[in-house]
Amino acid sequence: MEPHVDPTVSLCYKLLSDVARVRHLLSDEDTESLVHSIVSSRLDYGNSLLYGINKCVLQKYQHVQNYAARIISKRSKRQSVSDVLVKLHWLPIEKRIIFKILTFVYKTLNGMAPESFTTLISIRDHDMLLLNNVYLDSSYGRRSFTYTAPRFWNALPFNIRSSVSLEIFKRLTKNYLFNHFSALKSTAFLYQA
């Protein structure tokens, strides 16, 4: 995936440096809107495929997101941007990837995703909206949607899985990932083969 990541990161840095040059001319709201439109779409494009990829490759995306937050908040590179990410309600890259996977599962179960996704997951319990876990031996296979999606989905609380609309699901999932990410991750892979 590095052939995809490196050009994306390079382009984002170039575009963000252009925004940084004119930052003093823009209002905070305009800067946030501009940065969001430039960076988020590029970082989110196909990012669910990045699950399980080498952490140093993911870190490149995280640096881009941090740089974008620094431009919006007018912070120097020595200052932390963790609180800025929370204020902007931006999930860190690793959480964004899991958010995207969970959104695909929700769309698949509710008939909003392409039909090809329906063959990748199967429901184990209709009442509790639980999915069948697939067991794979290879580390490559464990990065697949078929393997990871049921584990993260089943680890979500029932009130999130049973959301009545995509907007509500996204809002609840994002809040849950902000507050309970480590619990979700450990629960999802508790019984990993």
Model-derived segments and their meaning:
Residues 1-193:
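Hydrophobic/basic alpha-helical segments
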